A protein has these predicted regions:
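Macromolecular interaction modules
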Residues: 1-108
Length: 108
C-alpha cells in the first residue's frame, strides 16, 4: 500500500505578520496535536516561482499518512475538522487549497 499526504496550500496573506504568528503559535501546534494518524509534518515557506516571479502561495503544508483512507479518516474526525477550519480562519489571503495525494518515493 502506498502512503499518502494531505497538502494545504495557503494563498499569500493580506496580513503577513498576523498570519505567520497565528500559523506558528496556533496552527502548527494544533496540527501536531489533533491530526490523528499522521507520520510526518512538513511546512514550507514559498519564496518565489521558479522564474523568480511572485508566487500565488505563501506556505504549503504537507501532512503524511500511511494511506489515503487514513487521510480521509483524519479529515472526518473532530480534530481534523477543527484543524481544517482553523486553517481557513487564519488564511487572510483567501481559502487554502486542500489536496490529497498518493505518495511515490524514488531513491537515488
Amino acid at each position: 500500500m502506498k502512503s499518502a499526504k494531505l497538502i494545504v496550500m495557503y494563498p499569500v496573506p493580506t496580513d503577513l505578520e498576523t498570519f505567520e504568528r497565528r500559523y506558528a503559535e496556533e496552527h502548527v501546534p494544533m496540527a501536531v496535536e489533533k491530526l490523528a494518524g499522521k507520520t510526518r509534518f512538513v511546512a514550507s515557506l514559498i519564496k518565489s516561482n521558479a522564474d523568480q516571479s511572485a508566487a500565488q502561495f505563501h506556505r504549503i503544508a504537507e501532512v503524511y499518512f500511511p494511506s489515503i483512507s487514513d487521510v480521509q479518516a483524519c479529515l472526518s474526525s473532530p480534530g481534523g475538522q477543527e484543524t481544517a477550519a482553523h486553517a481557513v480562519e487564519i488564511s487572510s489571503g483567501g481559502t487554502p487549497t486542500f489536496l490529497i495525494s498518493e505518495v511515490e518515493t524514488f531513491d537515488f
